[in-house]
Design a protein with these regions (language model features):
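Short Cys/His-centered divalent metal-binding micro-motifs
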Residues: 183-205, 269-290
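Long, contiguous alpha-helical scaffold regions
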Residues: 225-290
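Short Fe-S-cluster ligation motifs
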Residues: 171-188, 215-228, 265-280
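Histidine-centered nuclease catalytic patch
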Residues: 144-183, 243-271
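Short, charged surface segments at domain edges that flank catalytic/cofactor-binding sites
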Residues: 98-151, 173-175, 206-237
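Mixed-charge, low-complexity interaction segments
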Residues: 1-135, 151, 161, 184
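Glycine- and acidic-residue-rich phosphate-binding/metal-coordinating active-site segment common to enzymes
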Residues: 161-162, 169-189, 197-212
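Short cysteine-rich clusters marking metal-coordination/redox-active sites
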Residues: 137-141, 187-190, 238-241, 273-276
Length: 290
């Protein structure tokens, strides 16, 4: 998902991904195994990811709450409030607790100062870089409106939610920095679905299953939010040929099943590109985007 943008950064602490460091630390401690009686165990790895995401989000929100409640007090008192907040959520060896408290302090400090927000100069440079190369959405691959299109139609832009937005891959509100490796061109629609979620595992994907083969009925189950989760799970690339959706010739997408003998459910479906359909690489397919 990474698209690097060339920006000058004079404040490295604003670019550091403290959130990713915290996620990696928590993930190393979460040893949640998928039951051995499940045949396709790999398909359920999202359960562990969801737990890690939840713990990180809870810790960040709890730390922000603790800081806000002690905003007028000395720094040491506020630091102690964060340490107590960590102790309320998890119980790890002392040095691990201390490291988590340190990372949360850095994250909350930056959130309070809006430190991960790009400067006007940085944003203009990134936008210009993306516009010059006509970057499409890094998740769904749709063409973006940069406001300078020769046939720019404001009504279409508003209706299709295609406006260019700059996305922090790891959300600012969860500790993501403003470094060039954490930025990508995104459409308004995907950015709204993504919000402060950390991965597709944060969506209610268990509800997405249908016994029907009727395209209309299947489409009702796999609505916009779940289609977004599928695209995010695949890293913005076709499940069959591996090509990034933003590099395909057009914007067509098809919903296909991994196992055609199984029903349409989240762990059994994938999204394929129009080029795979044209190349007869799909045994079946429900078109979900023209």
């Amino acid at each position: 998902l990474r698209r690097e943008y060339r920006i000058r950064e004079e404040a490295p602490d604003k670019a550091t991904n403290w959130g990713e460091q915290l996620w990696t630390l928590l993930a190393s401690e979460v040893r949640l195994e998928v039951p051995t009686f499940i045949v396709d165990r790999e398909a359920y790895d999202f359960v562990r990811t969801r737990l890690v995401n939840h713990l990180l989000s809870r810790l960040v929100v709890r730390a922000k709450q603790a800081r806000a409640a002690n905003a007028a007090l000395p720094d040491e008192t506020r630091a102690e409030a964060i340490r107590r907040a960590v102790d309320d959520v998890i119980a790890l060896p002392e040095e691990r607790q201390a490291l988590i408290s340190y990372l949360l302090t850095r994250i909350v400090d930056r959130i309070e100062r809006r430190g991960a927000t790009l400067t006007a100069v940085q944003k203009a440079r990134v936008t210009g870089f993306a516009r010059a190369r006509r970057h499409r959405c890094y998740i769904c691959g749709r063409r973006l409106f940069y406001g300078d299109d020769a046939v720019h139609d404001p009504d279409e832009e508003k209706e299709a939610f295609r406006s260019f937005e700059l996305d922090h891959l790891f959300p600012q509100a969860r500790g993501g920095g403003r470094g060039s490796d954490n930025l990508a061109a995104c459409c308004e629609s995907c950015n709204k679905y993504k919000d402060v979620n950390l991965s597709f595992a944060d969506f209610p994907i268990e509800m997405s299953q249908s016994p029907s083969l009727n395209p209309v009925q299947v489409a009702k189950v796999f609505d916009g939010r779940i289609k977004f989760a599928l695209l995010w799970r695949q890293g913005g690339a076709c499940a069959r040929c591996g090509k990034k959706f933003h590099d395909t010739a057009d914007e067509r997408l098809y919903l296909v099943r991994r196992d055609v003998d199984d029903a349409y459910h989240f762990t059994n479906v994938q999204v394929a590109c129009g080029e795979c359909e044209d190349g007869d690489m799909l045994d079946e397919g429900i078109k979900i985007r023209d």
